[in-house]
Curated annotation (Swiss-Prot):
The chain crosses the membrane at residues 10-30, 40-60, 71-91, 102-122. Belongs to the fluoride channel Fluc/FEX (TC 1.A.43) family. This is Fluoride-specific ion channel FluC. It comes from Bordetella petrii (strain ATCC BAA-461 / DSM 12804 / CCUG 43448). Na(+) binds at residues 78, 81. GO terms for cellular component: plasma membrane.
Amino acid sequence: MTQTLIPLNFLAVAIGAALGACARWLAGLWLNSSAWPWGTLLVNLAGGYLIGLALAVLLAHPEWPQWIRLAAVTGFLGGLTTFSTFSAETVGMLERGAYATALGYAALSLVGSLALTALGLASAHALR
């Protein structure tokens, strides 16, 4: 699929990213604690599942306009998930000497996100 630089595509990414970033911020406010960043973990795992689901649905509908994929995947899911926050939280745990917690968080985030991306793809295929 070729990318077209049109104002609608910019707007789709911007609106999607703003909504995704706000959802991530709210999840952090509601769920993060000093002991464990549950909000970040949740949005990264949910994002893994949702991107798998979205990609499968979008691949099944190549006739859909480009802005839908840009708003949903590049915008919303790009704004929702965060590798930089995950990295900062993991390094913070390491700096506090919480090595086992940091390792568990990193492993759960990585393996969980990969597994949920695969589950999202499988879910979309099962619904066809």
